A protein has these predicted regions:
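Extended hydrophobic/Leu-rich segments
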Residues: 94-96, 115, 137-142, 420-426, ...
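A short, charged
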Residues: 113-115, 120-125, 146-159, 293-295, ...
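Generic beta-strand hydrophobic packing signal
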Residues: 63, 123-124, 134-135, 152, ...
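Short beta-strand/turn micro-motifs composed of small residues
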Residues: 118, 163, 211, 393-396, ...
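Short strand-coil-strand connectors
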Residues: 80, 88, 119-120, 164, ...
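Beta-sheet repeat architectures centered on beta-propellers
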Residues: 1-90, 100-109, 233-248, 253-255, ...
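Hydrophobic or amphipathic alpha-helical targeting/insertion segments
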Residues: 105-139
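Beta-propeller and closely related beta-pinwheel folds
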Residues: 50-60, 93, 97-102, 133-291, ...
């Protein structure tokens, strides 16, 4: 008997038992992984690392992107209250003439500049000009106190700010006029709901207004026709974990859910939970209000920086691949405190003031990208019989280097590994382009063992045999690596000559 698996793109699945997890032969779910991602929608590959982008010199509290006329710059705030604008095109770091009192900044792009607020600083606007002038917005609450620590959004040409149970909105096209009658104003304790607003986020033709246990939809273009309706009894923990992706708006509650527009009438409905496969992990998280989600559109991914109860930093990132509907895990060695999208890429910042460009290079700024992947326990057709596996092969993609450790867990025992060996397949039977240093005029040559030049393979796929000893009811495959030079790109698993041992 022969059993083969050519779709390894199931991602981590914590919702099934050990015996259930390996039943699906069409798509392989993962028992666990670290720094492994889906490769070409079918295989698995080691994730890329990160590299140092900028060193500010003190702990960073916030990152954001400011854009004007297709030119993007990075906004950086620090623990001492400094605000920097980094212009990458001119390699310039400009200090803004404003010192923050708070350490929890929120950002909102409006017109060509950016609005900011912290838990101790009122709303202000930074103009995107040569001097990055600061304009105080002077937003006061109903008791004439400065509004701080609020949620913000832009909707229908206005700035919307929510604090406690009140939503304030600016005059049309203005970021600092919250007083003009019949243009600016506020909405207070709508639907007799006195609960605090946790987040504001535009979605389609609506402004989604989230509270802890409910979400409302606001419509209209002027104070005369603004209207709010209760949509669902499912709320959001905070604004940092809400993202718009394609036709949906994802938000974090006791799981991750979505508002989605469906049907010919474009009706809004509440989608099903997308975090059910990793729901077990939620018991390890701390306060979910601190969760940060960023949409990495280039890779069709959402990166969730969940705060773990036993970790003061954001070392572990849960990545949702929404094309493959799969989850995988990224573990970053640096002490990450925040992240943002800048120029379409993911950037993170640590507690030492260093900013990193993520999903780049083969190391974490010089440190090895430690990786691990565990298959489910594979019963290979019949879970009630012990089976001898005479031949097992990894199908490897030789456009990538493969150098990893292999081990096997047997018969649903996840503690003890067996059959430990090393799989090594690097630049085998590759051709390299000729250059001016070659002694002849041939266009290409076989690569020497020590070559580090670009290569292409004669055969894209290669088979590497590995040993699985003894007769077993089920086997779990483990692939791992801890050295800088180790990596993997696996596109299939083949079990040949499988016999029932009865």
């Amino acid at each position: 008997m022969e059993v083969a698996y050519y779709n390894l793109a199931g991602g981590i699945n914590q919702s099934l038992t050990k015996t259930e997890l390996g039943i699906d032969t069409k798509k392989v779910n993962w028992a666990d992984s670290e720094n492994i991602e889906i490769y070409q929608n079918r295989g698995i590959v080691k994730q890329k690392g990160n590299t140092l982008f900028l060193d500010i010199g003190e702990e960073i509290t916030g990152l954001a992107e400011i854009s004007a006329y297709d030119v993007n710059k990075m906004v950086i705030t620090t623990i001492s209250g400094k605000i920097y604008i980094y212009d990458e095109n001119h390699s310039k770091k400009i200090l803004v003439d404003k010192t923050l009192k708070g350490i929890k900044p929120v950002f909102l792009n409006f017109l060509n500049g950016i609005l900011m607020m912290t838990e101790a600083d009122g709303l202000f606007y930074i103009k995107n000009n040569s001097k990055y002038e600061v304009v105080e917005c002077d937003l006061k609450d109903l008791s004439d106190n400065t509004v701080t620590g609020a949620s913000m959004a832009v909707y229908k040409g206005r700035v919307w700010v929510a604090k406690d149970a009140t939503i304030y909105y600016s005059a049309l096209g203005s970021y600092n006029d919250f007083k003009t009658e019949k243009d600016a104003g506020y909405i207070n304790e709508f639907h007799t709901d006195t609960g605090s607003v946790t987040a504001l986020k535009p979605y389609k033709d609506y402004l989604a207004v989230y509270k802890k246990d409910s979400v409302y939809l606001l419509t209209g273009t002027s104070p005369d026709d603004f209207a709010i309706v209760l949509f669902a009894n499912k709320g959001a923990v905070g604004a940092g974990s809400i993202v718009n992706v394609e036709n949906k708006q994802y938000f974090l509650s006791n799981g991750i859910f979505a508002l989605e527009q469906v049907g010919e009438l474009n009706q809004i409905q509440l989608g099903s939970e997308i975090s059910s496969k990793i729901k077990q992990e939620f018991s390890s998280f701390g306060k979910l209000e601190g969760t940060l989600c960023i949409h990495y559109e280039k890779r069709s991914q959402m990166w969730y920086f969940f705060p773990y109860a036993d970790d003061n930093y954001l070392h572990t990132v849960w990545i949702n691949d929404y094309i493959n509907k799969a989850w995988y895990k990224r573990v970053i060695p640096q002490d990450i405190v925040t992240a943002c999208i800048y120029n379409g890429l993911v950037y993170t910042a640590d507690n030492k003031g260093k900013i990193y460009k993520e999903d780049f290079g083969t190391t974490f700024n010089g440190e090895a990208v430690k990786f691990m992947w565990k298959s489910p326990f594979l019963a290979l057709s019949n879970p009630h019989h012990r089976k001898m596996i005479d031949e097992f092969y990894f199908l490897l993609d030789t456009e990538q280097d493969n150098d990893f450790n292999f081990s096997v867990y047997k018969d649903y025992d996840s503690e003890y590994s067996d059959d430990i060996e090393k799989i090594y397949s690097i630049h085998q039977d590759h051709l390299i382009w000729a250059d001016d240093m070659m002694s002849d005029d041939l266009p290409c040559h076989w690569t020497p063992d020590n070559a580090s030049v670009p290569v292409w393979s004669v055969n894209k796929d290669t088979m590497e045999k590995a040993e699985i000893s003894e007769a077993n009811y089920a086997v779990q495959l483990c692939v791992s690596g801890e050295d800088v030079t180790q990596s993997c790109a696996i596109i299939g698993l083949q079990f040949r000559e499988v016999y029932n041992d009865d």
